[in-house]
Amino acid sequence: MGCPLLNTEKFLGGEVITMRSVGNGAGEFDAVQQPDMEGFDKTSNHAVPWKVEEDGPVYTSYKMRTPIRNAVIEQTLRVYHQVKNIDMDVDLLNWDAVLYREYRLMWPLAFQRSSVSYEVPFGALTVGKDEMPGAAGERYYVENSKQRPRGIGNWLSAAGEKCAVTLSSSVAVADYIDPTDQPVDYTILQPILLASRKSCHPLGNDFIQPGDHSYHFSLTSHEVNSPLREEFGTSSNEPLVAVYNPIQYGKAFLPEEVSFVSVDNPNVKVTAIKKCEDDNSLIVRMYNCSNKEETVHLRMFVEPKEIIHTNLIEEELSSVQEIILGKYAIETYKIKF
């Protein structure tokens, strides 16, 4: 991309930190609690060499194992040779299951002024721009734009002036601001791996999550406002399943390559393919992740006889010759064969 991606002055790319984080499991009430520095530790405090595990034409993988407060961290890094992405598997092992301890994976970015976005259902949210104005109300008084950490979907992304970074994630919650003392002013993508909590009920139990925990992440860079953000962030969490030397049916007629349904517009995402509730038609639900009207064509394994625009509960609205989605639209179509 021609621009630096990581700023490793304070944290290394992909290192794990742990902090104390006192809070409840069901509701944080006015604001989500923030961690503090009691018992702070990070994997770079216990530096060990990375060892080459595999080396081939597709990727080279490296592995390291090191202690951290109350656990052991094992990380596997895969650097791909033909495609621009790095995979990281993180295993949190021998966890002592203590209360009020939090672990985060740190990706410090070399972006002084960046916009942070993440996947939400049927779209993406940009921090400080797309939240509902004000606070949620009732007992919640903190402005929505200032609440963090955030619940995320498949990915978390940050865009600088010249390039962007997207991190696919297997966790539900992430942060983007340095939570430690003397915080830095650049963005740090932080999937939260584990946080032990106590029930908000006065007689409730502790949620200490005993056992080993495993996570998977993928990192890539791309141009700002590129559709690769959604494509990479989602596809990395939905890998292809390989079938080796399958038994062939005697009357097999399908070609070696065939797609059940595909679309020709990278800004349109298919979220559901299912049988219609009322008949044997096929239902396809999709959304437009761009801020302009988009036209999309479905390529199917059998030519459809009719495409019908429906509402969300699959009631027919009108037959269409072409599928056009308005900006950020979520639409449902019935396919008849």
Report residues per predicted region.
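C-terminal (or distal) subdomains of carbohydrate-active enzymes
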Residues: M1-F337
